[in-house]
């Protein structure tokens, strides 16, 4: 079946060329798009007009030019999905944007969605996880690289989640993220995975965020926050320190539908598996490419277009203000498999126990052991900082990592990389 699927892709579509090596991903909460029966927000045709939102979306899409566009708060009807494609993506002679059929187990009035450039990728699978108050959607994509000819595929999994909003619903958000992490462990550990959406989290200390990035029991499934290495992780809510990273709200006043208060929360995320962060599986995060579109760091507790905007043109700032109370987040991924380049291998040596609370054992295969019986190791954190170096003697070595803070780490030896989690206690 897999070979037949690959064969059809090769026949039907051109393969990616070197000019298409970078993939742009954008995640956006569209604020009750096409939904006027939410029961939560006072959003009507008069103050959240779909036609005007489409005008804004086209402006933003033309500026960002994403290849993968995932959204939250999209109305649940098939007609709305078809209209969105026709009015905003497949326009001006373009016909390559695709999406998938709606799955809505929760029967929510707003759902998640994905739109993708079918010249570069195809959707193989769409699964909806039963989370509350709405489903979490899992989209498995395959890129059209030259490796398809050999029957190989480069996979990217996009998990779009929109857990419950509000300061008092941390337990609900934790339950949603536990469902996500359990599914990742069962199906996509050690693969290229993005988890994205409006997470409604006020601080990095929230248990749901910690579960995604640090505390989940299977270290293979943990996610990396691209803002970790630039100081973007912390107590985000109403904290000016994190002004460059906030995504909500785009306006300082409310008209009933849009939240007020200006930019003072980081609710919107794209987190990545370490396979993407480090480039283990032929897709690599482009360093420093992650940002909240339109956030110039100068609009803390202000409207996004107040007194101009240094990050985007005025037309884009105006569109961001008009369409939603959230900013979209975007990142770039480098797809390098079509040239057979892979300068970093995952595994090749054992690290155990994993997780660890103090000592790790590093075991090298005999063929990888240096002639003189010694080779250097480096231990790095998710921010790319080297924290420890030393020598592995022979085919095995004990390394004391008790002084490291709890979290995910990478150990580099002889051009190979493995990962481990440091934790305070083992259960």
Give a label for each model feature.
Residues 335-346:
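Low-complexity, Pro/Thr/Ser/Gly/Ala-rich linker/spacer regions in secreted
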Residues 1-21, 341, 424-425:
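Bacterial Sec-dependent N-terminal signal peptides
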Residues 344-427:
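C-terminal outer-membrane/trafficking sorting elements
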Residues 20-337:
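Divalent cation-coordinating acidic motifs and surrounding scaffolds
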């Amino acid at each position: 079946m897999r070979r037949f699927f690959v064969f059809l892709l090769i026949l039907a579509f051109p393969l990616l060329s070197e000019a298409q090596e970078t993939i742009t991903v954008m995640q956006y909460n569209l604020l009750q798009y096409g939904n006027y029966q939410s029961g939560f927000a006072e959003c009507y045709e008069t103050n959240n007009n779909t036609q005007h939102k489409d005008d804004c979306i086209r402006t933003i899409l033309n500026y960002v030019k994403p290849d993968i566009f995932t959204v939250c708060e999209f109305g649940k009807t098939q007609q709305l999905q078809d209209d969105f494609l026709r009015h905003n993506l497949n326009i001006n002679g373009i016909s390559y944007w695709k999406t998938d059929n709606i799955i809505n187990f929760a029967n929510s009035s707003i759902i998640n969605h994905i739109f993708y450039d079918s010249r570069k990728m195809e959707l193989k699978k769409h699964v909806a996880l039963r989370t509350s108050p709405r489903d979490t959607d899992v989209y498995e994509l395959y890129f059209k690289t030259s490796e398809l000819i050999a029957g190989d595929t480069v996979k990217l999994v996009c998990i779009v989640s929109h857990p419950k909003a509000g300061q008092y619903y941390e337990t609900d958000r934790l339950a949603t993220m536990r469902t996500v992490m359990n599914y990742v462990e069962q199906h996509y550990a050690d693969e290229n995975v993005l988890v994205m959406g409006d997470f409604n989290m006020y601080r990095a200390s929230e248990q749901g965020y910690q579960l995604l990035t640090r505390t989940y029991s299977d270290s293979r499934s943990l996610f990396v926050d691209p803002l970790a290495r630039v100081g973007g992780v912390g107590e985000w809510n109403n904290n000016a320190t994190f002004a460059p990273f906030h995504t909500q709200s785009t306006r300082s006043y409310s008209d009933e539908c849009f939240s007020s208060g200006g930019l003072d929360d980081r609710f919107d995320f794209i987190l990545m598996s370490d396979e993407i962060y480090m480039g283990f599986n032929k897709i690599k995060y482009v360093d420093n490419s992650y940002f909240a579109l339109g956030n110039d760091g100068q609009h803390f507790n202000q409207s996004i277009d107040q007194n101009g905007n240094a990050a985007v043109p005025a037309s884009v700032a105006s569109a961001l203000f008009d369409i939603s109370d959230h900013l979209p987040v975007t990142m770039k991924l480098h797809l390098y498999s079509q040239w057979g380049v892979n300068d970093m291998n995952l595994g090749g040596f054992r690290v155990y126990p994993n997780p660890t609370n103090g000592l790790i054992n590093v075991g090298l295969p005999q063929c990888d052991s240096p002639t003189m019986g010694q080779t250097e190791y480096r231990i790095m954190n998710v921010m790319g900082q080297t924290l420890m170096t030393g020598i592995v003697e022979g085919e095995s070595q004990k390394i004391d990592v008790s002084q490291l803070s709890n979290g995910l780490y990478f150990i580099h030896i002889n051009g190979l990389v493995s990962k481990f989690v440091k934790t305070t206690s083992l259960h």
